[in-house]
């Protein structure tokens, strides 16, 4: 079957469903694709097509994720839905599915449950910027006071994790009724309202090209008579010939000037996000730069050594450790292009971390790395990946 082409005239936004098991995430996903396909084109996806999500491997971690897409009046959405709780944990920590916003699904019949809380916490830790709520299974609740009670609980829970609980939009409906085509306030209309809410509440993400210039350094060469060239793929922004740049990480930050940009042996005026380039640096010696540092627009990124991280530890089946680790564990942390040794402090009351667990750690690196909150990393032992993590909060 030929895939239907989306007209890419609309801005693109990445979202996903989160929430407790059996609260209706997958049914809601099916309902959105079905109703939006009727209105704006695209392919409707049935529940079992989404539920049988294929396994993917991201940094050696096995994750089952369903990817669907649909259009609204003003946008093109890519939407992820995971079959199991562990898949969400892995997905959010590895950043396999970056979310510009999340749809938190809460059953009106049950209210918030343990995974509701855990997914909100994960969203906070990994930097999901916006959450909208779909209160599902409204057809099973007759008492409007009960709906209000659940709404208050959800708002309190969101506020307790530093989301704006009082302002977050909550749409009440029944994904099942909508999927069955019932055109009531809790049926099809609720789904349309939810998508309109996503359009208005979740802002369009800043494109990579519009962010400040950043290039993780992969290699360093000296070219006689020209100076030092660093190579790598521009992660974000634009660098123009003649601009000042900073070399950040591992050593003290240095300022220098970009005197040339080269791609495929051709000289360019600038390097843009996504380009694999060589950047010529004025007056910088070959031994003053190394792999693992970044080239960045001055003042936009700082080196840090200590941070709080949300970490997923690979299970034995995924090729991870066979044994737990304890406080003071010292693996390598792989950031962008290089490994740095660091020490882990476990939260109080946590004796050890088992393979397959997710945990919050405080990491102290032995050398500073250019980082912002939200930066992903791998945890390695002798070149073998044993975990994945994300910088949740910078300490120093």
Curated annotation (Swiss-Prot):
Region of interest: G3: 81-84
GO molecular function, one term: guanosine tetraphosphate binding
Residues given in the record as GTP binding sites: 19-26, 81-85, 136-139
Domain called tr-type G: residue spans: 10-206
Gene3D superfamilies found in the cross-reference section: P-loop containing nucleotide triphosphate hydrolases, Translation factors
Primary location class: cytoplasm
Pfam families: GTP_EFTU, GTP_EFTU_D2, GTP_EFTU_D3
Region feature G5, mapped onto this chain: 174-176
Gene Ontology terms: cellular component: cytosol
Binding residues for Mg(2+): 26
Region spans: G1: 19-26
Repeat is among the record's keywords: no
Record-linked HAMAP family: EF_Tu_B
Similarity comment: family membership: Belongs to the TRAFAC class translation factor GTPase superfamily. Classic translation factor GTPase family. EF-Tu/EF-1A subfamily.
Function: GTP hydrolase that promotes the GTP-dependent binding of aminoacyl-tRNA to the A-site of ribosomes during protein biosynthesis.
Record-given protein name: Elongation factor Tu
Lineage summary: Bacteria, Pseudomonadati, Pseudomonadota, Gammaproteobacteria, Legionellales
């Amino acid at each position: 079957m030929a895939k239907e082409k989306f007209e890419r005239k609309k801005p693109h936004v990445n979202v996903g469903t989160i929430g407790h098991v059996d609260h209706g995430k997958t049914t809601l996903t099916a309902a959105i694709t079905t109703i939006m396909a009727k209105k704006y084109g695209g392919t409707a996806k049935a529940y079992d097509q989404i539920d049988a999500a294929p396994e993917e491997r991201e940094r050696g971690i096995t994750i089952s994720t369903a990817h669907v897409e649909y259009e609204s009046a003003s946008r093109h959405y890519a939407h992820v839905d995971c079959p199991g709780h562990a898949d969400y944990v892995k997905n959010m920590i590895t950043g396999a599915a970056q979310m510009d916003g999340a749809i938190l699904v809460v059953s009106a019949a049950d209210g918030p449950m343990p995974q509701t809380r855990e997914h909100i916490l994960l969203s906070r830790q990994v930097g999901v910027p916006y959450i909208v709520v779909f209160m599902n299974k409204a057809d099973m609740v007759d008492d409007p006071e009960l709906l209000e009670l659940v709404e208050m609980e959800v708002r309190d829970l969101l506020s307790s994790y530093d989301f704006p609980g009082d302002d977050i939009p909550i749409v009440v409906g029944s994904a099942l009724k909508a999927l069955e085509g019932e055109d009531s306030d809790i049926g099809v209309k609720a789904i349309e309202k939810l998508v309109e809410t996503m359009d208005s509440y979740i802002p369009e993400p800043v494109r990579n090209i519009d962010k400040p210039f950043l290039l993780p350094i992969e290699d360093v060469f000296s070219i006689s008579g020209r100076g030092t060239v660093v190579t790598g793929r521009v992660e974000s922004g634009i660098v123009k010939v003649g601009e000042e740049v900073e070399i950040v990480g591992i050593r003290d930050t240095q300022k220098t000037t970009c005197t040339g940009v080269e791609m495929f042996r051709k000289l360019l005026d600038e390097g843009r996000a996504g380009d694999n380039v060589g950047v010529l640096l004025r007056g910088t010696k070959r031994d003053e730069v190394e792999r693992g540092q970044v080239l960045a627009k001055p003042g936009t990124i700082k080196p840090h050594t200590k941070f709080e991280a949300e970490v997923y530890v690979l299970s034995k089946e995924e090729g991870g450790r066979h044994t737990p680790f304890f406080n003071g564990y010292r693996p390598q942390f792989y950031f962008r292009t290089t490994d740095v040794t660091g020490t882990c402090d476990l939260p109080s009351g946590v004796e050890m971390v088992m393979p397959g667990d997710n945990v919050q750690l405080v990491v102290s690196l032995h050398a500073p790395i250019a980082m912002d909150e939200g930066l992903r990393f791998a945890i390695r032992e002798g070149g073998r990946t044993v975990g994945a993590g994300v910088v949740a909060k910078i300490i120093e």
